[in-house]
Amino acid sequence: MIQISDTAKSHFLKLIQREGVPGMGVRLSAVDPGTPRADARLEFADPSELVGDEWLIDCGDFTLYVASASVAWLDGAEIDYVTQATGSQQLIIKAPKIKGQELSQVASLVERVCWVVENEINPQLASHGGRVEVQEVSAEGVVLLRFGGGCHGCGMADVTLKQGVEKTLMERVHGVIAVRDATDHSTGAAPYISRDFSP
């Protein structure tokens, strides 16, 4: 169920009336759902642009159309239009399921490691154009990783591995006892910091 505040409905209605298109509504969809970069998208929806499988939410003077593929990701979402302390107004969408839900402890060790890598570690590495991929997780809890992007060949990869990736995985995933790097860093084409770097 998606909750829309009265102030958000009034805001949407004002925008729709400004467009002056009969039957126009608002379409809500999830962009890149289940990933760290997931976001909610709101846009005007002319009746002729609708696919036909959207879920309809009657908002009184207009309809909110929810893309059918986005329904599960947007379940429990709240849309509000609030006045900030500064006096400015802002549309706020809270969609707690849009980025996916953290796996429970009953998930396998591999699933939990992959979830933390994709949802916590890779978003941080992306700021340097890097990423890491899980190559293997042994039954004993040793994780074998391969760095890519700006991390492939980076002079700080060892520090990133020990102080960032390994520390995070060991704190967040019960059962991980060590993390190893399987990357051949000598083949890195565009490292964030060259391995020849000396401060």
UniProtKB/Swiss-Prot annotation:
Stretches of the chain forming a coiled coil according to its record: none
Record's cofactor remark: Binds 1 [4Fe-4S] cluster per subunit. The cluster is presumably bound at the interface of two monomers.
Keyword Kinase recorded: no
SUPFAM superfamilies: Fe-S cluster assembly (FSCA) domain-like, HesB-like domain
GO biological process, one term: protein maturation
Residues annotated for [4Fe-4S] cluster binding in this entry: 151, 154
Cofactor: [4Fe-4S] cluster
Keyword Metal-binding: yes
Alphabetized Pfam families for the sequence: NifU (PF01106)
Keywords: 4Fe-4S, Iron, Iron-sulfur, Metal-binding
Gene3D superfamilies: Fe-S cluster assembly (FSCA), HesB-like domain
InterPro entries to which the protein is assigned, alphabetical: Fe/S_biogenesis_protein_NfuA, FSCA_dom_sf, HesB-like_dom_sf, NIF_FeS_clus_asmbl_NifU_C
One of the record's GO molecular function terms: 4 iron, 4 sulfur cluster binding
The protein's role, per its UniProt record: Involved in iron-sulfur cluster biogenesis. Binds a 4Fe-4S cluster, can transfer this cluster to apoproteins, and thereby intervenes in the maturation of Fe/S proteins. Could also act as a scaffold/chaperone for damaged Fe/S proteins.
Quaternary structure, from the entry: Homodimer.
PANTHER family: FE_S BIOGENESIS PROTEIN NFUA (PTHR11178:SF51), IRON-SULFUR CLUSTER SCAFFOLD PROTEIN NFU-RELATED (PTHR11178)
Family classification: Belongs to the NfuA family.
The protein's name: Fe/S biogenesis protein NfuA
Gene behind this protein: nfuA
